[in-house]
């Protein structure tokens, strides 16, 4: 299968579905990790340097999965649902031809998250019969969309779980690849210190995955809901 995971920011996929992507990769599936914005909205540092740093971190994380990284480069914090953005999303869908899409919940807390979700659901049907100015093959198959939990799982009732206990240490390394988000800098390449849970990303990842693991009787899990719409449902389990 072609698995397309679409996150608004460079670290979103790692935290919310990194374990699931690792399991897909281990099963031999083709995994594509798409980062929609350029990550420049950081309170410290030159925006161009911050963006370059965050792209490097995202690539390091994708390498752990063995995934292809797609960097769309929209301005961080300024994503809009407009025709140019929709065309970029349609091009992405046509190029990857996904069998499954994983993305943000439509009611997540951040505008970039909400708009990423909206752009996915707005363009997947358009990729069936794409605008004439776009070259490539249309996506003429049912493509289910799985929504990741919003931050802290607020107002999110899971429908399916993925046991990530066996890959959780690798998922933690994915999350910790994004050093610019939890280290004070400027030396983001300094060795990490034990215990790793002194870092906010490590604490949040463990607490969240243990929470969902408790719900389905395993140590660590990730949780998902399905977009329930015409042409988006299939009579089989797709998640690993």
Q: Which stretches of residues belong to each language-model region?
A:
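Active-site rim/loop-helix segments in enzyme catalytic domains that contact anionic ligands
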Residues: 1-96, 225-226, 231, 235-237
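Metal-dependent de-N-acetylase/amidase catalytic core
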Residues: 1-4, 45, 81-240
């Amino acid at each position: 299968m072609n698995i397309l995971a679409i996150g608004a920011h460079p670290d979103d996929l790692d935290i919310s579905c990194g374990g699931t992507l690792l399991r897909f990769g281990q099963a031999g599936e083709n995994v594509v990790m798409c980062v929609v914005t350029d990550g420049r909205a950081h309170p410290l540092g030159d925006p161009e340097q911050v963006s370059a740093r965050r792209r490097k971190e995202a690539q390091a994380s994708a390498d752990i999965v063995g995934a292809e990284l797609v960097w769309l480069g929209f301005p961080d914090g300024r994503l809009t649902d407009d025709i140019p953005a929709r065309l970029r999303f349609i091009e992405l869908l046509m190029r990857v031809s996904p069998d499954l899409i994983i993305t943000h919940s439509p009611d997540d807390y951040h505008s970039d998250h909400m708009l990423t979700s909206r752009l996915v659901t707005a363009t997947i049907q358009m990729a069936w019969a794409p605008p004439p100015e776009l070259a490539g093959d249309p996506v003429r198959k049912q493509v289910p969309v799985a929504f990741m939990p919003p931050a802290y799982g607020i107002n999110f009732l899971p429908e399916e779980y993925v046991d990530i206990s066996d890959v959780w240490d690798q998922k933690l390394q994915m999350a910790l690849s994004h050093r610019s988000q939890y280290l004070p800098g400027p030396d983001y390449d300094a060795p990490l210190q034990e215990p790793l849970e002194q870092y906010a990303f490590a604490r949040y990842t463990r607490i969240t995955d243990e929470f969902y693991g408790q719900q389905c009787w395993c140590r660590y899990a990730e949780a998902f809901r399905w977009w329930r719409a015409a042409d988006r449902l299939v009579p089989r389990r797709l998640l690993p």
